[in-house]
Regions:
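Non-catalytic interaction-recognition regions
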Residues: 1-137
């Protein structure tokens, strides 16, 4: 295992920890701009989920429990880090392709529920690795 201290200190997308934390912070910012009740967010009508990036993100977050179990069974925490990096990549693609704060309340709340679920996964995955999940960067 080679640890690159210079890479670990960088604050850009080449640093996998920064990349994951940045996804978490981006989600925090969108939810902050919305300023609604996050506890009440849920997907109310799955028919609005049609975007390929949404489907990829849903698939990615659904794989979290299995990724954690496998990492624990194999004593391989790096697998969690690899999973989180892939999940963050799916989120960043979705973020770059999607408007979240839109007039259609149903679609907006479904999208916000999806990114909130993603934020939950990223935060808990980072926590398992002993890494912070900042809301701002």
């Amino acid at each position: 295992l080679i640890f690159d201290i210079d890479l670990a200190k960088t604050k850009n997308n080449e640093n996998p920890v920064y990349y994951i934390q940045y996804a978490h912070a981006r989600i925090s910012r969108v939810l902050e701009q919305w300023n609604g009740n996050q506890e009440r967010l849920s997907v109310k009508n799955g028919d609005t989920i049609k975007n390929l990036n949404e489907l990829k993100l849903i698939k990615s977050i659904s794989e979290f429990p299995e990724a954690v179990i496998q990492a624990a069974e194999e004593l391989a925490p790096h697998q969690i880090a690899n999973y989180l990096k892939e999940c963050a990549a799916e989120f960043h693609s979705y973020y770059n392709d999607t408007k979240f704060l839109i007039d259609d309340k149903n679609i907006m709340e479904n999208r916000l529920a999806l990114i909130r679920a993603t934020q939950f996964i990223l935060k808990n995955g980072l926590n398992l690795l002993g890494i912070s999940a900042p809301n701002k960067m």
